[in-house]
Amino acid sequence: LLTAVLGELPPGSSFVRFMFFDPLARERIVNWEHFAAASVAALRGELGRHPHDGLLVALIDEIRTRDQDAATWWNHHGVQDYASAAKRMVHPVVGELSFDIETVMLPHNTDQVLVAYTAQPDLGTARKLPFLASWSVQGSDRP
C-alpha cells in the first residue's frame, strides 16, 4: 500500500531518501518535520553501531549536504532508536490518513528492523485503504 499512499519510489531508493529529496514527502506527510528529525537521529544511532559502513556514511553525507534541515538536526547530535509513533499523511484523493507505527528490532539480527503501520480508526483510514489498494492495482500513477 505504500505505493498507493505515496507513489512509486525510484529503484534503489529508500524511505529516508524519499523523506528528504522528494518534494511530495513534505506535501503528503503532515508531521514531516517530526519524522524527518527522528530519521536523522536514527541515522546517527545507526552510524554509532556501524561507523565503517560506507553506504550509510554516504547516505548521511548526501542528506546533510542536500537538505539544510537535516544538516541542522545532525548538528544537534540527537540519537534515537526506533520507536513507536503516529504518522499522518494527506492523499489527494482520499484525504487524511493516520497510522500507528510500531518498530521492532529482530532478536536474532539486530541489523534488521520490522516496521508495521496500522490504520488508526478515528480518521477512517481503515475504510480508505481498500479503495487506495484497488486504485493502485489499476495502475494509476501517483497524483
Per-region residue spans from a language model:
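Hydrophobic protein-protein interaction segments
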Residues: 2-143
